[in-house]
């Protein structure tokens, strides 16, 4: 993988809300729905990509890119998945999620 990356750290103060599905910015960025739509460009295409960028335009702390891969960083352990599931690691205090474009 190469290209620009986005690092997102989610602290414990947000995690309980995110795990419950409260629609915080952090939840929206990591939700399975958004990742599926961004990962499968062959199905949704460039027009959908533009719509997603427009929908997220108000989030000034996020550089919006057509992200395809996600890498979890939980201490020294990392795992690459196409779909992010934040419920997989409920005991960690924070997540640094690195998304990299192809």
Annotate each PLM feature.
Residues 1-102:
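Catalytic phosphate/metal-binding cores of nucleic-acid and nucleotide-processing enzymes, i.e., regions
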